[in-house]
UniProtKB/Swiss-Prot annotation:
PROSITE patterns: G_PROTEIN_RECEP_F1_1 (PS00237), G_PROTEIN_RECEP_F1_2 (PS50262). The gene is Prokr2. Homodimer. It comes from Rattus norvegicus. Keywords: Cell membrane, Disulfide bond, G-protein coupled receptor, Glycoprotein, Membrane, Receptor, Transducer, Transmembrane, Transmembrane helix. Belongs to the G-protein coupled receptor 1 family. This is Prokineticin receptor 2.
Amino acid sequence: MGDQNGNTSFAPDLNPPQDHVSLLPLNYSYGDYDIPLDDDEDVTKTQTFFAAKIVIGVALAGIMLVCGVGNFVFIAALARYKKLRNLTNLLIANLAISDFLVAIVCCPFEMDYYVVRQLSWEHGHVLCASVNYLRTVSLYVSTNALLAIAIDRYLAIVHPLKRMNYQTASFLIALVWMVSILIAIPSAYFTTETILVIVKNQEKLFCGQIWPVDQQLYYKSYFLFVFGLEFVGPVVTMTLCYARISQELWFKAVPGFQTEQIRKRLRCRRKTVLLLMGILTAYVLCWAPFYGFTIVRDFFPTLVVKEKHYLTAFYVVECIAMSNSMINTICFVTVKNNTMKYFKKMLLLHWRPSHYGSKSSADLDLKTSGVPATEEVDCIRLK
């Protein structure tokens, strides 16, 4: 259940109504209904699909574990300690919240759909639409949050006097969610359940978007709009931001005498920018195959839909795209952040023996107040 925009199918010869286009977010697509059905073979029973099912299951389990636990730790620590609430962490919190919701709400249903029931939806229309909508919103929030972080870094390093304040950041965060929620509305509006005959006398209930056949042009226009606004545009903008930042940090001479503190700050900023560029690269590598596959499938369907294992390949490509949330969580929450230290202190405070009384809480807050929320040596203090 990845990006919901690219899954569409035009074939009125099966169970879906003949005046509709089936757009199946749970990985059914433009030419799915055009594939000749073999009465003797169910694609879900092939060895290729079995192998893909294992890969998908492992990936979904990883997302639930890494994104569920990691982002919960980050959110809990951020809620408990005000010192963690700098501009950068507030922007990262958008990623954490969206990925956490997907990990605990969407992934269990996806595990049931892909792995347990092997492409059959058994949870009703409301959950079908809700899960797909939440998954789509999460993708757009993640993309827009990464873009906001890149802009924040650009302003902080290239134009430090113009850096965002908390009021501007709050407006930007609200805009990130508002845009994501609005753009994803079609994924909920057009989502329904569809019964398909996979092999003779065998049916599966698919959860997906059903676009009227006379709205094919609208669907394609909508997909291209989202592709430009939520992939091409952000990637180009982030690339330009980090290119300009790199020029500032690596190729611009620093005037005056460089103290050890200045050199340390410069090294820290360089490492941070390298981390952010790595995250951008991972985002492109994870999502470019999915968008590319979707474009070929929706605009040049004859190139792929006759391939026997085309659907299985699409599931794997989508699985790779979904796994990007794990990379974000590992990089932002567990690798280069002080969040784990604060979370451990919070647990220590909670489980501390009662005879220490209220003093333990005061002592803990006093001690943590001297620990930077984002350490220079860890290269995540970005001011």
